[in-house]
Each structure stands twice: as C-alpha cells, then as structure tokens.
Amino acid sequence: MQAITSPFSESWGEYRLRKEDFSWHKANEGRLQGKWLRGLWSNELYQERRSSTTGRADDMMTVATLSLPPTLEIQKFVELFKLAYMHMRFVHPMLGVTIETNVFSIPLLPCFVYEQVTSFDEVQAWADRTVHVHTCESEQDRALSMSDRIQCVRNTVGTRPLPISQHTREWHIICFGREEDAHHVALMSYCAHSVSDARAELLLLQQLLDEMARLEGAWPVSASHPSHPAAHEWGSEIKRLTPSLMEMIGVPIDAFEEEAARELVRSVTSEPSLRLDEGRPIAEPELSETLHARVVFSKEETDALHQAAKAHGWSLTHLVDAARHMAYMQVRRPYLEAWHWSPIPEKLHTDFLIPMDARYAILETFRDGASGHVCNATEGFTTTIPLMDPYYIPIERELASSEKELHELSQVRTLAYMAQSLCLQYNAQKKQAKQRMMSSIPTLVLAGVFLPTYPFQSLSPEGFSSVGVVDRLLTTRIPLPGHTQPIDIIDWTVGLLMSKHRGSLQFSLHIWTFQEQLNLSVVHTPHITKERTALFLDTMRSTLKLFLMAYEQHGKPIDIPAAPPTPFKEPTLFQYVGRWLQSLLSH
C-alpha cells in the first residue's frame, strides 16, 4: 500500500490541500470574485459524489403529503410557502448555497459558494426559481391517485440533474386532480445530499409549516409588514453560514490519524460481503427512473417490536438491521446454495453503512439553538458481518421436516444472533465518531474521490443506506389561525436519485418511524427487479413478525446463540453431481 501521509502534506503533490480553503472566505480573484467559498470535506465530500465521468448521483428526494383546511386555497398555500421559504433562507443561509468545482488546486474538489444578498429582489428571484407548482394539465393527470401522481412527478423531476451551480435545493408543490384529493398537496424537496440529510429535511419542513402558520396569523402580509421577509436585514445572514461537520464537533480540519485510516481501509476491503446482483449495468451516467416499494407496520406491531427489542437489550434499529442482513442473504440464497466451479468473488461490496446523526456532538458554539442544524450532520460507520452468518433455514422448510417451538427455529435464532452481533458493533462504534472523522480524510483521498475515474473498480458496490428518523421531530398537525381545521401531515417518505452508471447505487433501504409506525422502504432502479425487491421486503417483514410471535409465545427473552446457529452445510458429492446434471438439463 502506498505510504499514507496527511493530504495537507506537500508529499501528496497534486493532492496537496490548503487548510484555508475549507473555511468560509471571500474570493478575491477569479470567476467567483466577491463570493464566499468553502471546500467540502469529510461527510459532505462523501455525499457529493457526482461527476460527468462516474455518474454518482445520490441526491435526496423527500415527500410530505398534506391535508389542507377546505378554507385554505391552494394558491394562498403556495404564496405562504414561498414567504416562509424566503424567511428560512435568512435563518439558514446554507439553503442558498451553490456548488462549484475547478476552483481550488484540485479541479474535482467541490466547494460551496454563497453570494451575499444585497436586496430582497434577489431573494424573491431565488424563490421563484426554486419553488415549482405542478398542477394537473391533462385528464390522465387528474385521474391519478395521490401515490401514482407523486411517483409520476418524482420520476419526471428526478431524471433531470439538479443544477447545483444555480441552486442546491428545489421544492415541488404537487396538486392532485381527483375530487376526494382536492384539499391535498404534496411537498417534494429535491436537494443535494451534501447540504442536507433526512433529519434536516424533517426539521426544515417543521419550521416551514410553523412559519406559514405565523404568517397566516398576521395576514395580510405586505412587503412593508414586519413579518414579511423583505423586512429582514439581508446581508447579515452571512454570519450564519456553517462550517464543516468536522469543525462543529471539534475535529480540526487537518486532523489525521494514520493507523485509524489504515484500519478503516482494511475493514471495507478485506471482509467478504454479499452483493445483491451478479451483474451490473454499464451505461452512460444519465439519471435513472427509480422504483419505490414499502412496508408499513401497524402502531401495535411497532410498539411490540420496540418492547421485544428492549427485553433483549437491543434497540429497534438493531433488530430491524439484523432482519435486513437476513433479507439480503435470502435474495442471494439460490447463488449461495448452488454449486459453481468458479463462484463470483463476494468481496467487492462495502460493508453495510450505518448513518448516524452527529447533532448531539455539535459544540455549543455552532448550535442553532431551538431551530436545530438544518444541514447534513450525518456521519457513519460500517458493520462487518461474515458472509454466511445471516444464513438460516426458512420456517416452511424447517417445519416440513421437524416439529419445533417458534423460539427454536433457525430463522428466529439467527435473527437473535445477528441483532446481538450488530448491537455490540454499534455500541463500540458510537464511541469513535471523532476517530472516524480523523481517519476519513486520508481514506477518501486513498479511495480516489478526486480522480475522474472514481470509482475505479470494475464492479462497484450496490450500497445500502438506512435512515433512522423518529416522528417526534415532526408535528403532524399544524393549527392555522383563522381556520377551524389544521394542516395535517398524512404521510412522509424519503428517497434518493440513482443513475445507470455501474458506480451508482442501484438499491437502497430506508428505515424510519412516522406516526408511531415503522416504515421500511426500498428505492431501486429497474435493473433490480420488482420481484427481488418484494422478496427482500417480505423477508424482513416475515422475519420480524416471526420473531415477535416467538417472543410472545415463549413468554421471556429468547436465548441468544453464541455462534451462528445455522452454519451452511456444504453439499455432498452426490448433491453436487445432481445439481450439475440438473443445470445441464435446464439448458
């Protein structure tokens, strides 16, 4: 391995970085002269994985579906939303940043750009440019259900790249055409992942709706009204531009920990891991249509899963993540159980990435007070699970050959073993946030994220992501002054964009809780079939429900195996020959 040195050291040659490039500073020359700049680093750089060569495109697209009071016209809702959004730009100026490359010594190193506001007219033009209203233009549009209409707009918008040199966030207000949906709208946020995460989206949505209620209480709000965003001291918002997450949690920009970097590199390249599919699409990096599949547990089931997890010393996240690993194995079962003379190596998939909200670690100096940090504050870690640990015998196969209590079943015991293994890894990793931050700098450089050929592997990981969002962040009912009925948030979903390039995500799992109901959602490209996705989600759902039934029937916590309870048994020579003959006949 090449000797690891600090990316701020001169020995990096073309990779030499300047610390001052990563703090907000005013450009004194060049095409961005007079604008404020800051290089992206750490988690921001990881999320900003786009280029014309690699085709990475992991921008976020969240959707909140609202039920409006019958007395609130859609046109007025749009007007209130725009005013509230302009106010949020003053409170959180990061909403107004753009992203540029070819600015610093490394051409592909992206940087945030902010142009200080000199008049309210500029803010109004920005809002007009970034807030779009989608009305039903045809009979076909008007006949669509709310979910189908959202999916239609999502794929229309989501196959058009976000113009990040103009803005890094767009809002799309979706109207519906059926009579029963007349007083509903959907708020779709399309934004660069480097400037936001799922928790930030919820925080921002809550603040927007609260501000809309405040404006409605002061209505009519003219430009001279003190509640109007035109009354703000525009230009002073520059003081609230936020530094990188590393700085906010107290890690110096040029922090470096060589051994941690080496260990991180080893952990994501040496362990065998499953890949979802044997083949990958190889195409131009244009954005792909994405498909969405979802499982929603009832409030009672969600509460019971919480209680079952707690009884075993786990969180619900540990339990759900264990089911995720088992479902991932189930999708690959035919390959794992089949005999191959030359099996495809299973070492190219980076281990499961677990996002973590780092807002708890932000220093008091950088706290946004009650408003929360409405930017990307996600750091993460990987869990290392041996290739065959999630292997299990499905309940229908096991009960066909033996009689067992539910808590004795392979599927239940494997889930318990996996949850315990993940719990131990989670607890160990949570204490190492700053260490991971220090090691992520050289790791990102070693991974070649500054190279136009990144990712350089011929087979790149599909990648999994998860979002743990709790609904207490989002008030689902917002009273409106002057209206007898409130605005109700009746649904919320999170997704991301994908491209056809082999380096882009093809499949991503998201986990959240909304209105006390556990949601499991998969976003995938057509390359990953609907059947595979359905098998994945059905396995997660059935495994969790089976575990819950076993725990309730057993009446006490299930014994946690000390080792994988269902080791994979190699087929006998007779079985090998039989499968070989069967494969010949099938062709």
Regions found by a protein language model. Give the residues of each.
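Intrinsically disordered, low-complexity domain-flanking/linker segments in eukaryotic proteins
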Residues: 179-180, 334-347, 391-411, 481
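Hydrophobic "lid/gating" helix adjacent to the active-site nucleophile
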Residues: 85-100, 302-370, 551
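Hydrophobic alpha/beta scaffold of the E2-like acyltransferase core of 2-oxoacid dehydrogenase complexes
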Residues: 297, 320, 408, 419-421, ...
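Short beta-strand/turn segments that mark the catalytic/cofactor-handling region
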Residues: 2-12, 103-150, 154, 175, ...
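A short, structured beta-strand-centered segment in the mid-to-C-terminal lobe
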Residues: 361-424
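Non-catalytic N-terminal regions of enzymes
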Residues: 1-239, 317-333, 481-587
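Flexible, P/S/T/G-rich "lid" or insertion loops adjacent to the active sites of thioester-utilizing
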Residues: 254-314
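Secretion/export-associated helical scaffolds and adjacent low-complexity Pro/Gly/Ser/Thr-rich regions
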Residues: 220-274
